[in-house]
């Protein structure tokens, strides 16, 4: 049974009594070397804990009573628990509970999640589901209210639509700590009334607005974006991007996840300059299940920053006090200091981020990489498990692309993927016509793409072509398709594309690979078609099987799943496909597939 977490206002008298020697502590940690994130010092402090919070530090011998648990921390560095300031839990493909099970042993004790993936499928109900689930966990789960649902109104159909009214309502919910990443930076700069209505509702609630400004060359645009009250941004990919954010007073979130490896460049904003690092944050953004198992979570991100030359204490500040101050929770979190929750990591080696024990609310919850506490079981309602609503079963006919009469060859627009890069190239390619149909082709490395509306709406299907996956046969499909998470199918023949799509509709969503009418591998993700409630180890194993099946079909990409999932996100350059058709994202307009 996990202890009840009590607000500071309810325990002030007890904390003061322990600090002044009038009341014994519940727990005392002795002999450790405390990382002081306020001053950057390492101090030989003992720590007294009462009611899950730190009552005092330094010489706390007066707080030791006959019932006090004394923990010997000799040989350990002690630092605050790590806090992820920007994470999409859904990207891990597991629920909040299973995510907590995976990351707590590695030292992550708090997250600030942006649940905009589930919001696009289940709306406010989905956001509330994840927030409520997080309240029952030792991991401290905060959420920012998704701001861009859908990501590109008018170009796609999602399962919900948010505006100022929804944002204002969510700001009153417990656990909502701010506004999620404002991807509609053109709307911010153009003065879009709905966008600024969301900003106004958040600022009126006294909560921060997190950013997503993806125009690195536009400093004046970034300045205008910041003037709207947006206080952080994780879209730095170059040294100068991070520096510009720091210089404008933003929190520069530097990310290292499964698909984004930005720290090598962005950390130079700190290591090659003399700028103050207290507005720098280290975040994960998107981390897949196999990454959580193989390299870890924030422990890996901090380690990478140190490997690139950042002082270990500055790296720790970037996942503790800096994060807490960004979100206005520094009175409770982010430091080993009186009044704060006793979320404490025991490290054998600071530079290697060698975490041996993890304490949350004054209780050791993990040791030696293993979780020591049971997490509550969660029952998900049927509406969450059955979120794939196709207008009708798919047939090969749905994927036919008719050529203009009399044509033997046509020119078509093609999305060309760039490995390890979120962008696509907008190409025009000449392709053959067979029996009146525009066809995919192995020789040209062209696969057909379909985005099928799956939220019970109009059932529309957008069709296009993609180059770069290397498929020789078969088809793959996924309901993880940013950000509206419609049913995304890529294939070399229409029959296999239909089978792939229908397979996912039958299991509530997930990822699948098929060939010649047979399912090669399937990862069910029944929670909104995005997540599994199975342990991360099981999900990672099934995901690996899907990856092997992709390789059997000819794909040689290192990280193909995120590459595919972004094909349908119409806010990224240069060409994307939604259920409504092709979007030229540089001109922000719908375009025809066949050009001549």
Curated annotation (Swiss-Prot):
- Enumerate the UniProt keywords alphabetically: Hydrolase, Manganese
Q: What molecular function does GO assign, one term?
A: adenine deaminase activity
Q: Which family does it belong to?
A: Belongs to the metallo-dependent hydrolases superfamily. Adenine deaminase family.
Q: Which gene encodes it?
A: ade
Pfam families cross-referenced by the UniProt entry:
Adenine_deam_C, Amidohydro_1
Q: What is this protein called?
A: Adenine deaminase
Species name: Moorella thermoacetica (strain ATCC 39073 / JCM 9320)
Q: Which cofactor does it need?
A: Mn(2+)
- Coiled-coil blocks: none
Give the NCBIfam families listed for this entry: ade
């Amino acid at each position: 049974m996990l202890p009840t977490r009590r607000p500071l206002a309810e325990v002030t008298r007890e904390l003061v009594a322990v600090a002044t020697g009038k009341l014994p502590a519940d727990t005392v940690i002795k002999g450790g070397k405390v990382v002081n994130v306020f001053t950057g010092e390492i101090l030989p402090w003992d720590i007294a804990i009462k009611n899950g919070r730190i009552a005092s530090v330094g010489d706390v011998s007066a707080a030791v009573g006959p019932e006090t648990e004394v923990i010997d921390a000799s040989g350990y560095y002690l630092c605050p628990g790590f806090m992820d300031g920007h994470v999409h839990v859904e990207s891990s493909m597991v629920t909040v509970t299973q995510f907590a099970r995976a990351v707590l042993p590695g030292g992550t004790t708090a997250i600030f999640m942006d649940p905009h993936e589930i919001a696009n499928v289940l709306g406010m109900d989905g956001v509330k589901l994840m927030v409520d689930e997080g309240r029952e966990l030792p991991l401290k789960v905060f959420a920012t209210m998704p701001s861009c649902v859908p990501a590109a109104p008018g170009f796609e159909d999602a399962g919900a639509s948010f505006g100022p009214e929804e944002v204002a309502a969510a700001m009153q919910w417990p656990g909502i700590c701010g506004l999620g990443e404002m991807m509609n930076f053109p709307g911010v700069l153009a003065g879009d009334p709905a966008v600024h209505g969301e900003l106004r509702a958040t600022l009126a609630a006294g909560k921060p607005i997190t950013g997503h400004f993806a125009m690195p060359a536009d400093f004046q645009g970034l300045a205008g974006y910041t003037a709207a009250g947006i206080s952080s941004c994780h879209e730095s990919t170059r040294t100068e991007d991070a520096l510009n954010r720091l210089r404008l007073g933003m929190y520069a979130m530097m990310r290292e996840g499964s698909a984004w490896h930005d720290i090598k460049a962005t950390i130079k904003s700190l290591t090659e300059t003399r700028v103050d690092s207290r507005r720098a944050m280290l975040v994960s953004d998107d981390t897949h299940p196999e990454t959580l198992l193989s390299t870890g979570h924030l422990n890996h991100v901090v380690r990478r920053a140190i490997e690139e030359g950042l002082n270990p204490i500055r790296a720790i500040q970037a996942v503790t006090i800096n994060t807490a101050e960004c979100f206005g929770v520094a009175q409770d979190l982010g430091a080993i200091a009186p009044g704060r929750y006793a979320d404490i990591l025991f490290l054998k080696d600071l530079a290697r981020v060698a975490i041996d024990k993890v304490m949350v609310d004054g209780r050791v919850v993990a040791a030696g990489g293993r979780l020591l506490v049971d997490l509550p079981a969660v029952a998900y309602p049927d509406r969450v498990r059955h979120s794939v609503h196709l207008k009708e079963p798919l047939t090969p006919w749905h994927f036919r692309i008719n050529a203009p009469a009399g044509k033997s060859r046509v020119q078509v627009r093609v999305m060309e993927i760039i490995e390890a890069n979120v962008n696509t190239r907008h190409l025009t390619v000449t392709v053959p016509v067979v029996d009146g149909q525009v066809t995919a082709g192995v020789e040209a490395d062209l696969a057909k793409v379909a985005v099928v509306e799956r939220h019970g709406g109009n059932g529309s299907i957008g069709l296009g072509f993609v180059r770069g996956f290397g498929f020789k046969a078969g088809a793959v499909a996924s309901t993880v398709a940013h950000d509206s998470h419609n049913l995304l199918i890529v294939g070399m023949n229409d029959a296999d594309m239909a089978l792939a799509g229908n397979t996912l509709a039958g299991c509530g969503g997930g990822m699948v690979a098929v060939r010649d009418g047979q399912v090669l591998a399937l990862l069910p993700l029944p929670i909104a078609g995005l997540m599994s409630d199975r342990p991360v180890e099981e999900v990672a194993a099934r995901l690996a099987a899907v990856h092997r099946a992709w390789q059997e079909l000819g794909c040689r990409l290192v990280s193909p799943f995120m590459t595919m999932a972004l094909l349908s996100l119409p806010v990224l350059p240069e060409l994307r496909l939604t259920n409504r058709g092709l979007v030229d994202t540089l001109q922000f307009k719908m375009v025809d597939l066949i050009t001549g």
